[in-house]
């Protein structure tokens, strides 16, 4: 038969300890529940211009939202190659990504115009276009495609490397098997040079160069340095044939659910990330040639660019029909 003796009453000290423990438990739970974790992915290493972009962005988001949002950063295509990552953001399976503009025309065709060869005079010109009315209007074109484009950033001017021969004039490119991005404008232009184009995800490029699957590739100095392409490429020519922007992208439905103040915090964080990203590109461009030469690459930095432009005259005529001569001239003449 169970005892009917009353249980001892807890002391006031025990009650206070219990209350404190419950308070801490519920407090920690509330804090954990209040913090939303998101992910952002890049295709390059952390120690790169893209790494600077997303590391800065993650820090700024947490700071500007009082820690209510935490952005986890992933490098070396840990969450997928650029095209896969962009598609994942569009579908909502990933929250954020930072991508070069290479695969973007497959999702937002209006951005193709930015990939026309020799469209921009220099980085100052490109940045002025992207930060001005033309670039900001292009950002709005992402809204209807499942994205919120938070800010333009930078990959840089693209240059050609290969393991076969020094490229001093356009004819030297003929017959080279080159990895290209999955970008229709790039592919059309490189075919105009007589290049055998091989579209390939960035994560596969080093091995393809190492094994001789392709002869060469083209990328900005920042990418060539961080990817250590000097280990598998002998010749580099500073062609500067295409300017490659980059973008902070967020799933549109997710962005729309944020309070207005938080939306602005994400935009401002992306802009700060872009600012430091561009500074890193400037740094890499300033020291990159000397670094790569010291590592054994032959670097040609004095080509007659007008000859390369002339070699693409038939292709550029097609681009004028595709995009409109007036639209191209508007970009070329922007200050």
UniProtKB/Swiss-Prot annotation:
One function term, GO molecular function aspect: carbohydrate binding
UniProt xrefs under InterPro entries: DctP_fam (IPR018389), TRAP_DctP (IPR004682), TRAP_DctP_sf (IPR038404)
Record bears the keyword Ribosomal protein: no
Annotated binding of (R)-pantoate, by residue: 50, 82, 155-158, 179, 219
Chain ranges passing through the membrane: none
UniProt-listed Gene3D superfamilies: Bacterial extracellular solute-binding protein, family 7
GO BP: transmembrane transport
Keyword entries, A-Z: Periplasm, Signal, Transport
Classification via Pfam families: DctP
Position of the signal peptide: 1-34
Localization in the cell: Periplasm
Chief place of localization: periplasm
GO cellular component, one term: outer membrane-bounded periplasmic space
Similarity comment: Belongs to the bacterial solute-binding protein 7 family.
Listed NCBIfam families: dctP, TRAP_S1
Annotated function: Solute-binding protein that binds (R)-pantoate and D-erythronate (in vitro). Probably part of a tripartite ATP-independent periplasmic (TRAP) transport system that mediates solute transport into the cytoplasm.
PANTHER family with a match to the protein in the record: 2,3-DIKETO-L-GULONATE-BINDING PERIPLASMIC PROTEIN YIAO (PTHR33376:SF18), PTHR33376
Subunit structure: The complex is comprised of an extracytoplasmic solute-binding protein and a heteromeric permease formed by two transmembrane proteins.
Name of the protein in question: Solute-binding protein Veis_3954
């Amino acid at each position: 038969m169970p005892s009917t003796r009353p249980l001892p009453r807890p002391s006031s000290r025990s009650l206070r300890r219990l209350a404190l423990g419950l308070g801490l438990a519920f407090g920690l739970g509330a804090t954990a529940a209040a913090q939303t974790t998101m992910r952002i992915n890049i295709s390059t290493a952390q120690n790169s211009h893209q790494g600077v972009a997303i590391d800065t962005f993650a820090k700024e988001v947490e700071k500007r939202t009082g820690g209510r949002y935490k952005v986890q950063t992933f490098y070396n295509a840990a969450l997928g190659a650029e095209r896969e990552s962009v598609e994942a953001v569009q579908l909502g399976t990933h929250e954020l990504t930072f991508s070069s503009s290479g695969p973007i025309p497959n999702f937002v065709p209006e951005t193709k115009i930015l990939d026309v060869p020799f469209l921009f005079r220099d980085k100052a010109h490109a940045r002025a276009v992207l930060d001005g009315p033309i670039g900001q209007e292009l950002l709005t074109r992402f809204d209807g495609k499942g994205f919120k484009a938070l800010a333009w950033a930078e990959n840089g001017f693209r240059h050609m490397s290969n393991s076969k021969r020094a490229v001093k004039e356009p004819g030297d490119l003929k017959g080279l098997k080159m990895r290209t991005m999955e970008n229709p404008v790039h592919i059309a232009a490189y075919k105009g040079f007589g290049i055998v184009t091989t579209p390939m995800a960035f994560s596969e490029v080093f091995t393809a160069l190492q094994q001789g699957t392709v002869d060469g590739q083209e990328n900005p100095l920042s990418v060539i340095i961080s990817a250590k392409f000097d280990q598998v490429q002998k010749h580099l020519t500073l062609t500067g044939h295409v300017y490659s922007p980059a973008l902070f992208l967020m799933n549109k439905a997710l962005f729309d659910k944020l309070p207005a103040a938080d939306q602005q915090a994400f935009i401002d964080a992306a802009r700060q990330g872009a600012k430091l990203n561009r500074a890193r590109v400037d740094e890499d461009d300033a020291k990159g040639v000397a670094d790569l030469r010291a590592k054994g690459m032959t670097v040609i930095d004095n080509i007659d660019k007008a000859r390369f432009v002339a070699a693409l005259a038939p292709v550029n005529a097609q681009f004028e029909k595709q995009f409109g001569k007036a639209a191209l001239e508007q970009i070329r003449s922007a200050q």
